[in-house]
């Protein structure tokens, strides 16, 4: 059984250079898990932050399902705690505070055991000229592939 991707942060790959990836668990309520199974999540403006030595996913939108809980409307952009091993947390803390890097969520998915997981990465912000160079390389690669595809023998 493969992983079931719920939401991806495509903006992160465009705005940041990904250095190292991690897999983290996430603390959710039952209604939020139900919303994730319905693929009602968005990571476009999400980021990670340390609060009192723990890592939290901030500004990630997980929609409220009307069928899940009728009498309580949770905050859809509430901070959600990420679950990592202590050594991983220490490594991330050092990278963020000493090296000036950022932690970016890449995607939310359900793994083989049907647990909700968040793929996070240590990333370095790209400058405008880096983004332009990446776009130019992608267009050149795309043009080369189409030229090879359309080439007749």
From Swiss-Prot:
GO biological process, one term: trans-translation
CDD domains to which the protein is assigned, alphabetical: SmpB (cd09294)
Listed GO MF terms: RNA binding
Main location: cytoplasm
Phosphoprotein among keywords: no
Entry coiled-coil feature ranges: none
Pfam families xref list: SmpB (PF01668)
Any one cellular-component term (Gene Ontology): cytosol
Subcellular location: Cytoplasm
Gene3D superfamilies per record: 2.40.280.10
Keywords: Cytoplasm, RNA-binding
Family of this protein: Belongs to the SmpB family.
Function: Required for rescue of stalled ribosomes mediated by trans-translation. Binds to transfer-messenger RNA (tmRNA), required for stable association of tmRNA with ribosomes. tmRNA and SmpB together mimic tRNA shape, replacing the anticodon stem-loop with SmpB. tmRNA is encoded by the ssrA gene; the 2 termini fold to resemble tRNA(Ala) and it encodes a 'tag peptide', a short internal open reading frame. During trans-translation Ala-aminoacylated tmRNA acts like a tRNA, entering the A-site of stalled ribosomes, displacing the stalled mRNA.
Protein name from the UniProt record: SsrA-binding protein
Phylogenetic classification of the source organism: Bacteria, Pseudomonadati, Campylobacterota, Epsilonproteobacteria, Campylobacterales
